[in-house]
Amino acid sequence: MIITIDGPSGTGKSTLAKALAQTLQFLYCNTGAMYRTLAYARLQPDWQEVPLEDFLASPPFSFSFSKDSPLQAFYGDHLLTSELSSQEVANFASLFSKEPLVRAYMQTLQKQYATVGNCVFEGRDMGSKVFPHAEVKIFLTAKPEIRAERRLKDLPQGSLSKEALMAELIARDQADQQRECDPLVIPQDATVIDSSDLTISQILEKILPLIPSHLT
């Protein structure tokens, strides 16, 4: 079974997806982290001038995904963690993900991972493009000021003001919604949830009734 959770940054997708996967004992795949991994690798000096086709054909990054562990991203042999949370990487990932070659490459990987077992996929086009026939589709929204507060917690203290981050989030939304390749949209048949004033437990209470009873 595939469950998709889509929505813009700061709506709580990652926290919800992890909690839902843990509750159901499903696998969890953070596709945003996959795009940020590509962006991080592409920003490294040795790879900035390499043609995109060659970069993807012999990538300096890799992913580990199995029934026993969540998605892990590597640059060479180095496990990427906090590097993927920087605003520079996030901003470049937004630009880089517009490339049709990049999206096709990533979607192929994501579909391969879906064969491993029951999975919760989190991203921006999971229910609309990658898994349009997913059994359960969720689309999260939240007020811009709430999203900015959440994202600030992931950034080094003092790196950005709430107002500046809110402006970046709104600009990112517009870019994601207006891009020609797989824009951010509410998937057909998705359940839309505003997470602004809800805890993760409250959101789970809304979602779990959508899951077949034998899986909950």
Curated annotation (Swiss-Prot):
InterPro entries: Cytidylate_kin (IPR003136), Cytidylate_kinase_dom (IPR011994), P-loop_NTPase (IPR027417). It is an enzyme of class 2 (transferase). Pfam families: Cytidylate_kin. SUPFAM superfamilies: P-loop containing nucleoside triphosphate hydrolases. ATP binds at G7, P8, S9, G10, T11, G12, K13, S14, T15. It catalyses: CMP + ATP = CDP + ADP; dCMP + ATP = dCDP + ADP. GO terms for cellular component: cytoplasm. Transmembrane segments: none annotated. One of its GO terms (molecular function) is dCMP kinase activity. Its EC number is 2.7.4.25. It is found in: Cytoplasm. Its main location: cytoplasm. NCBIfam families: cmk. This is Cytidylate kinase. It comes from Chlamydia trachomatis serovar A (strain ATCC VR-571B / DSM 19440 / HAR-13).
